[in-house]
Amino acid sequence: MKKKDKTYHVKNFYDGDKKLEKVVLEVKNGFIYKISRKGYLSSQAFDIVVPTFVDLQVYGSNQSLLSEYPNIKTLEKMDSFHKKNGTYFFQPTIASYPYEVIYKSLEAIKNYMNQNPESGCIGLHVEGPWFNPNKKGAHIIDYIHRPSEKAINEIIEKSKGKISMITLAPEVIKVELSLIHI
């Protein structure tokens, strides 16, 4: 769904580094592409506009872990929880688990994002299982292993573009990283 082009007049805009006063934000396809003072109308201005927060590592919310309940209902709970608490965008995360759990999570993410294109879900963060067992942190050792080229290609294929991040230990990857195309 293509977002409409819009213009917003803003008394106080925080751009992430500094506060700008009395500006006009021009938005195209859902993105701010121009900020200027030309044409500012105080009668149409919002008092304050700030960027939204983004949570890049979310295992679950409201008593639903994605690894335990890899379904649309869990993602709806995550989305609702984050919006109620001031975070618009979120990245559901699956830690080191068997591929079956990762695949079910991917399927839920694909379905949720396709059914809710305006949601705050930005894709799945696959955190493991391709870690160095000596540096596993809180990950379950039984699920940590070195990936094969086949395993990498399979998870990428199943993702259909819905993996937004993969956390791995580069020293355990024996496959040419140029083969990975998300």
Stretches found by the model and what they are:
Residues M1-G39:
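N-terminal metal-binding scaffold of metallo-dependent hydrolase/deaminase domains
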Residues G39-F46, S105-E118:
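Short amphipathic alpha-helices and their capping/turn segments at secondary-structure boundaries
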Residues Y59-Q63, E76-S105, S119-N132, S159-I173:
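Divalent metal-dependent hydrolysis catalytic cores, especially in the metallo-beta-lactamase
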Residues K77-S80, K104-N111, K150, E154:
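Alpha-helical scaffolding segments of alpha/beta enzyme cores, especially the outer helices
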Residues I102-K104, N134-I141, L177-S178:
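Short acidic, glycine/serine/threonine-rich loops at helix termini
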Residues N132-E157:
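Conserved phosphate-binding/catalytic loop of the ribokinase/pfkB sugar-kinase fold
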Residues I180-I182:
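Conserved small/polar residues in nucleotide/adenosyl-binding loops
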